[in-house]
Curated annotation (Swiss-Prot):
The UniProt record lists the keyword Methyltransferase: no
Transmembrane segments: 3-23
Main location, first listed in the record: membrane
Protein name (database record): Cytochrome b6-f complex subunit 8
UniProt-recorded Gene Ontology molecular function terms: electron transporter, transferring electrons within cytochrome b6/f complex of photosystem II activity
Complex and partners: The 4 large subunits of the cytochrome b6-f complex are cytochrome b6, subunit IV (17 kDa polypeptide, PetD), cytochrome f and the Rieske protein, while the 4 small subunits are PetG, PetL, PetM and PetN. The complex functions as a dimer.
Amino acid sequence: MDILTLGWVSILALFTWSIAMVVWGRNGF
């Protein structure tokens, strides 16, 4: 895996995690 692929994976993971936290926050509170 090269650095560009690793960068895209980390960005997508962070984006997915932030959306999941927003949805969980709305459902939790």
